[in-house]
Amino acid sequence: VYPTHRSASLPAAVLEATKQNAVNTRMVSGGNGLENFQTANPFPIPKDGLEVIWNHIARYRGGSMRRLVTQATPQPNGSYSLVYFQEEFTFRDALTDFDASKESNVLFYFKQRVTAPSRLAGNVLLVHETLDQVKEPRLAWLYNAGQRRVRRAPQVSYDGPGTAADGLRTSDNLDMYNGAPDRYDWKLEGKKEIYIPYNACLLYTSDAADDSLR
């Protein structure tokens, strides 16, 4: 267990947008979309569970990022296989040529490429994440490297199977929760102290073997 640090900081523009959201942002389409929303953190003073989930979905994540991800798929006998991804993520506000008049319902753009094992390497998932996914479902495409074909991927949502997870993860499991909130009833159940995977930089940067982290 690592000690907690207040290691998050936000740009002044994001803090100002958050102040404006506190006054102006409201939910539309039965809670499935946002109106008058700027940049990040739509409900800085959340009143219910749905507003808390929207704060998670639309939180500030640095504008854009690129990361390497390792996914383990464990089996009942304790064996497991590893899949390696390169992921790229960009919020619309980080794009200088973003045209809100054409894609006003887009929240961010996401690309995930499998780099290993070789049987999956080169497969790519591309997502245009929409704010109101009941009004306009998430736009997703899959490139199959073996077939050299691109197909639309409407199954990449809700409880559709997660990439290369052998059915052990759903699409909306990624990032704790993602996508439209309409299929759940969100409630605040109070607060309790828990351990969370945060401030674990020594673990992330260590040379610990995979077996020791199972």
Residue ranges of model-derived segments:
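Solvent-exposed N-terminal domain segments of exported/luminal and surface proteins
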Residues: V1-P137
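Acidic, serine/threonine- and glycine-rich low-complexity intrinsically disordered segments
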Residues: L125-L126, D132-C201
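Generic detector of intrinsically disordered, low-complexity, polar/charged segments
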Residues: M27-G30, Q75, A164, K187, ...
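Conserved small/polar residues in nucleotide/adenosyl-binding loops
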Residues: Y204-D211
